UniProtKB/Swiss-Prot annotation:
This is Protein mago nashi. It is found in: Nucleus; Cytoplasm. Heterodimer with tsu/RBM8A. Part of the mRNA splicing-dependent exon junction complex (EJC) complex; the core complex contains btz/CASC3, eIF4AIII, mago and tsu/RBM8A. Interacts with Pym (via N-terminus); the interaction is direct. Interacts with eIF4AIII. One of its GO terms (molecular function) is RNA binding. Belongs to the mago nashi family. PANTHER family: MAGO HOMOLOG, EXON JUNCTION COMPLEX SUBUNIT-RELATED, PROTEIN MAGO NASHI HOMOLOG. 'Mago nashi' means 'without grandchildren' in Japanese. It comes from Drosophila melanogaster (Fruit fly). Gene3D superfamilies: Mago nashi. Core component of the splicing-dependent multiprotein exon junction complex (EJC) deposited at splice junctions on mRNAs. Involved in exon definition of genes containing long introns, including the rolled/MAPK gene. The mago-tsu heterodimer interacts with the EJC key regulator Pym leading to EJC disassembly in the cytoplasm. Has a role in oskar mRNA localization to the posterior pole of the developing oocyte, and may also be involved in polarization of the oocyte microtubule cytoskeleton. Changing residue 91 to T: In allele mago-WE7; zygotic lethal. InterPro entries: Mago_nashi, Mago_nashi_sf. The gene is mago. One of its GO terms (biological process) is regulation of pole plasm oskar mRNA localization.
Length: 147
């Protein structure tokens, strides 16, 4: 698989007491990782980071997504976005393009109570894996001090 046929974007956020708070990241076909985290809690400011990742990271992302089987899911039976918040996941791999929108999921209890627990569980675990990978990449890229 070449990098030209891959794109991923994830967003989770809500508008509440502290304004529009959100986490968003995307991987572009050229390997650029864009990350934004906005929290107005205690007057925090928006954190924006950009970095380029190696081709092997892009290949691993594709593998994670393909192994998750998320491309076969449908968000129609999932809970719609509400006052608690919304999640969006957009993925392009080759000529396949999917876009999911659902409410924020606090835990597996929320997943199990949904109309499609199997599909939403697939989404839930994939999002956890993606967030873990992105937090690690951002942390490594911006916090490692040279010896």
């Amino acid at each position: 698989m070449s990098t030209e046929d891959f794109y991923l974007r994830y967003y989770v956020g809500h508008k509440g007491k502290f304004g529009h708070e959100f986490l968003e990241f995307e991987f572009r076909p050229d390997g650029k990782l864009r990350y934004a985290n906005n929290s107005n809690y205690k007057n925090d400011t928006m954190i924006r980071k950009e970095a380029f990742v190696h081709q092997s990271v892009m290949e691993e992302l594709k593998r994670i997504i393909i192994d998750s089987e998320i491309m076969q899911e449908d968000d129609l039976p999932w809970p719609p976005p509400d006052r608690v918040g919304r999640q969006e996941l957009e993925i392009v791999i080759g000529d396949e393009h999917i876009s999911f929108t659902t409410s924020k999921t606090g835990s597996l209890v929320d997943v199990n109570r949904s109309k499609d627990p199997e599909g939403l569980r697939c989404f839930y675990y994939l999002v956890q894996d993606l967030k873990c990978l992105v937090f690690s990449l951002i942390g490594l890229h911006f916090k490692i001090k040279p010896i």
